Design a protein with these regions (language model features):
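Short, well-ordered beta-strand elements
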Residues: 1-2, 41, 51-54, 73-76, ...
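Sec-exported extracytoplasmic/periplasmic mature domains
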Residues: 26, 30, 61, 78-86, ...
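Surface-exposed binding/hinge segments that line
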Residues: 55, 74, 81, 85-153
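Short Gly/aromatic-enriched secondary-structure transition segments
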Residues: 7-16, 71, 137-143
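N-terminal lobe/hinge region of extracytoplasmic solute-binding protein
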Residues: 1-47, 171-172
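Residue-level recognition of beta-strand termini and adjacent short loop/turns
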Residues: 46-47, 117-119, 183
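Gly/Pro-rich hinge or "lid" segments in bacterial periplasmic/extracellular proteins
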Residues: 29-30, 110, 126-207, 213-215
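Aromatic- and charge-enriched surface segment that lines or borders ligand/interaction sites
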Residues: 41-91, 124, 217-222
Length: 222
């Protein structure tokens, strides 16, 4: 994979790995297409369709035991909108008030962007216009949170090559956590004991192999 920084990667292989490691505000039901609670246990939408209030799951934790908070999402969204990071998907958040202006340098004040932590577990999002598909967009990895202290311990907010994504450094909030990464060989993820829905995670480990040949891939399942 290119990497496992959800604000940097762009490929399908990376997505397959990241959905095991990270979790956004919502998660998709692949059978029905319904948007299910993820890091947010519930949400409300204003009558004009422009304000969203997310109540975060108070049992949601990072793999190191830290609680997943509204401020984590505010900082993470500021990160993807930081132009010097060079994310390929900042426009995923352009539906927010002031987001495009912040990303393009019209304003340097992130307080003007429509995302606020009302309290520890309440996130308010203000959109420029009603966007019925906004909730569905939140299942895209570019909107997922990253662990601020881990990122900054190993680099700056806009560091594309920070060591925070390496085994032993990577702190995530999904059902699995990073166990090992053998370059050009395999990535192993293991069940995250701090995941809020831990008991429903039926696998103890998953192994991801880089396979570019369809025939090779087919033989691996025989």
């Amino acid at each position: 994979p290119q990497g496992i920084d959800p604000h940097i990667v762009t490929g399908v292989p990376e997505h397959h790995i990241l959905i095991s490691l990270c979790e956004g505000l919502t998660i998709p039901n692949l059978n029905s297409g319904e948007n299910l609670p993820g890091a947010a246990e519930s949400w409300t939408v204003s009558d004009d369709g422009k304000e969203y209030i997310f109540s975060l799951n108070k049992n949601a934790k990072w793999s190191n035991g830290d609680p997943v908070t509204a401020s984590d999402f505010v900082w993470s969204w500021m990160r993807i909108l930081t132009a010097s990071l060079g994310s390929q998907y900042p426009d995923m958040l352009y539906y927010l008030e002031g987001a495009e202006e912040y990303h393009t340098g019209v304003t340097s004040n992130f307080d003007e962007v429509g995302v606020k932590a009302i309290d520890t577990f309440t996130l308010k999002v203000n959109l420029k216009n009603p966007t019925p598909f906004f909730i569905g967009m939140l299942s895209h990895y570019s909107t997922w949170p990253v662990h601020k202290n881990s990122v900054l311990k190993h680099g700056a907010i806009d560091d594309r090559n920070g060591q925070w994504t390496r085994p032993g450094n990577f702190v995530c909030n999904g059902p699995f956590q990073l166990k090992s990464w053998e370059l050009n060989n395999k990535i192993v993820v293991e069940k995250n004991p701090n995941y809020w829905d831990y008991e429903k995670v039926s696998l103890n480990e998953m192994h991801f192999y880089p396979v570019s040949n369809v025939m090779t891939e087919d033989r691996m399942f025989r």
